[in-house]
């Protein structure tokens, strides 16, 4: 193979103006527009600037930058109508152009073509545009009844192809992929779910959240009975968990109670609990009370007592069958 013609040695420098990256071509030129080696790759992030430079010498008579088959610059002559592409340097040693605010449409093959006194030569660089991952669509907030199914969708775009991960913020549960399927959902699975996407282009991933609300019927979690003397204040308390929040009602025997001076009591209800307040306990107030918590999915009830001090009755209701069990144990002890 004959040695390369004078001036045939070329380096192609591709530099990111913002990132300060540089790529230098690997060797000698291909002759007569025949490319015997693959083009160098030059990667830049969307929105950054890219500088493409040909390093030449005094033997070069004509030089041009092309994108695919379109001439961008031939010497000082501008051929492109894109205002983002401009001539940066044109000297006997260097011919450089600048592309500002690089977009996906700029990705592709760029060719530096020049003419020496003997023949034409070219070298190439392939511009790769990376796009940070971002979420373009995500499910709206979801409300479902306990036992139902939920599908959450999170669509992300970016180059390279981004990963998508779903995470439940309450317990850290994670799932890979754009779609998160939850079958037979339970109340403990309610809360915020976060979609996170990343492709390594930016240090910070993109993330968005979806609130999942699980409806379920009331469950009474705590009750408080009282043992109070005549003329003193007393309080009975009932707590229930439910979504939507439960509506509370109080009963004495089978009679629905309400706040009022005639009854001598007051019903005070907050989000998850209700209290029956007695400002001045009288004899007619003693007895059994029932708290009922209900929403559109169901209801739950619990009993409690307001007792006199010194009463032999236990203020806490005993489980069914406990009295019978105690009686049987006492009879066995007496027989021994």
Curated annotation (Swiss-Prot):
InterPro entries from the UniProt entry: Ig-like_dom (IPR007110), Ig-like_dom_sf (IPR036179), Ig-like_fold (IPR013783), Ig_sub (IPR003599), Ig_sub2 (IPR003598), Ig_V-set (IPR013106), IgLON_domain (IPR050876)
Domain Ig-like C2-type: 33-122, 132-217, 218-307
Family: Belongs to the immunoglobulin superfamily. IgLON family.
Any one annotated GO CC term: extracellular region
Keywords, in A-Z order: Disulfide bond, Glycoprotein, Immunoglobulin domain, Repeat, Secreted, Signal
Glycan-bearing residues: 41, 49, 67, 137, 288
S-S bridge residues: 54-112, 154-195, 238-291
Secretion signal, residue range per the UniProt entry: 1-30
Protein name from the UniProt record: IgLON family member 5
Localization: Secreted
Lineage top rank: taxon: Eukaryota
Keyword presence, Transport: no
Main location: secreted
One of the Pfam families matching this protein, by short name: Ig_3
Alphabetical GO biological process terms: motor behavior; neuromuscular process controlling balance
């Amino acid at each position: 193979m004959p040695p390369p013609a004078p001036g045939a040695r070329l380096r192609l420098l591709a530099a990111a103006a913002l990132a300060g990256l540089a790529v230098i071509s690997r060797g000698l030129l291909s002759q007569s527009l025949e490319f015997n080696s693959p083009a160098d790759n030059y990667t830049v992030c969307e929105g950054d600037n890219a500088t493409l430079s040909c390093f030449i010498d005094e033997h070069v008579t004509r030089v041009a930058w092309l994108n695919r088959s379109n001439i961008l610059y031939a010497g000082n002559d501008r051929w492109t109508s894109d205002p983002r592409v401009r001539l940066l340097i044109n000297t006997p040693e260097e011919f450089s152009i600048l592309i500002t605010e690089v977009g996906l449409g700029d990705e592709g093959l760029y060719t530096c073509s020049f003419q020496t006194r003997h023949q034409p030569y070219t070298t190439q660089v392939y511009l790769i545009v990376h796009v940070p991952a971002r979420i373009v669509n995500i499910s709206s907030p979801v409300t479902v009844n306990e036992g139902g199914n939920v599908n959450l969708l999170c669509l992300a775009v970016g180059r390279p192809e981004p990963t998508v991960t779903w995470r439940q913020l309450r317990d850290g549960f994670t799932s890979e992929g754009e779609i998160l399927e939850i079958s037979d959902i339970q109340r403990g699975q309610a809360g915020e779910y976060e979609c996170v996407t990343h492709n390594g282009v930016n240090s910070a991933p993109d993330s968005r959240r979806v609130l999942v609300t699980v409806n379920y019927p009331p469950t009474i979690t705590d009750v408080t009975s009282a043992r109070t003397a005549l003329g003193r204040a007393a309080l009975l308390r009932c707590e229930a968990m439910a979504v939507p929040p439960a509506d509370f009602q109080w009963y004495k025997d089978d009679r629905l109670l309400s706040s009022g001076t005639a009854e001598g009591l007051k019903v005070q209800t907050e989000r998850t609990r209700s209290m029956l307040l007695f400002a001045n306990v009288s004899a007619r107030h003693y007895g059994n009370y029932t708290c009922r918590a209900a929403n559109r999915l169901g209801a739950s009830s619990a009993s409690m007592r307001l007792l006199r001090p010194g009463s032999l009755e236990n203020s806490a209701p005993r489980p069914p069958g406990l009295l019978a069990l105690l009686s049987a144990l006492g009879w066995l002890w007496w027989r021994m």
